[in-house]
């Protein structure tokens, strides 16, 4: 039980190189070697994740696999095994739930935990974070990084500051000192294009950013980005995550390491997000009727779009198709995208208000497949759909 606390305590918990770390845990022969998790190895494949050993070669997520092979030909390349990652994620999220019911899950490997008032249960924040790290390491063999602060923005920046296996606590009154230690490029959400624009005006540090008048920032990078950077440079939370309504939707999102307009990469990302969301809907026993997407562009402007159906969503394919339609309507195919999010809302417990249908259409068949996948998955067996498995030529 939580007890009243005068001060917010927010943890941002981020698994270290999650997909790659799961593969290295499952395959000891991969440990200590550059490992790349991604799609097809041809020109159109995209890196989904990579180990820290691979990052030393300049490899990052959303990079074409062909580029990664040129940068590090000796790397190990493995396909995405989303069901396995979801299995590990479920175990991790259950541990998080043991620490607080106030959890905002951002993706399979990342969450905000509101630990306000839990000191009587777990001790001071730093001690609670160490206990959390130990629990996860014991249960899964994986490491994570924890950022602790009084708001979501600072907690996120803190978790990124000392990866991997880090623990950084930004106490009240120490915000500016902490911010001045980080590189300007590491301000969360700051894309390459915006960074280049700031550099062209000789704004190269967080302190210089903070000393720049907000009206000038807005003229340089636009109103939305100017407002965001003005607040971020002062450690003020822009409210990106605090406005979420708990238990009203299931969503996931991805922030790209480099702004992108790669349409195939965006489609593949939305497919992975749809798979994650459908898995969580089935696991938690919910159905939903509304699909929504979120796009954040390189100038920090953020847009959402949604579509509500008359019937509950019944498959990952249905969610993905609607997401692609919304993307097509909302995106001009030219603006650089920094973040893409996907979610399902208008939730209700499965079977609570569903009408009996006379005929079983294709969507119903997809729904049955989704449920079968969940049953197999619940028995500890890995299973992936063909759409999430890299294509191979000549049946090899």
Annotate each PLM feature:
Residues 3, 12, 186, 194-337, ...:
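DNA-contacting surface of Y-family translesion DNA polymerases
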Residues 111-117, 304-307, 349, 354-359:
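Short, hydrophobic beta-strand segments
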Residues 177, 259, 348-351:
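Surface-exposed, charge/polar-rich loops and edge strands
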Residues 311-396:
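Acidic, metal-coordinating catalytic segment for phosphate/diphosphate chemistry
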Residues 1-228, 234, 241, 363-396:
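Gly/Gly-Pro- and Ser/Thr-rich, intrinsically disordered tail segments characteristic of DNA damage-repair
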Residues 148-153, 233-234, 287-297, 339-348, ...:
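A glycine-rich phosphate-binding loop feature that marks nucleotide/adenosyl-phosphate handling sites
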Residues 18, 41-44, 298-301, 347-349:
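Short, charged/polar surface micro-motifs in flexible loops or helix N-caps
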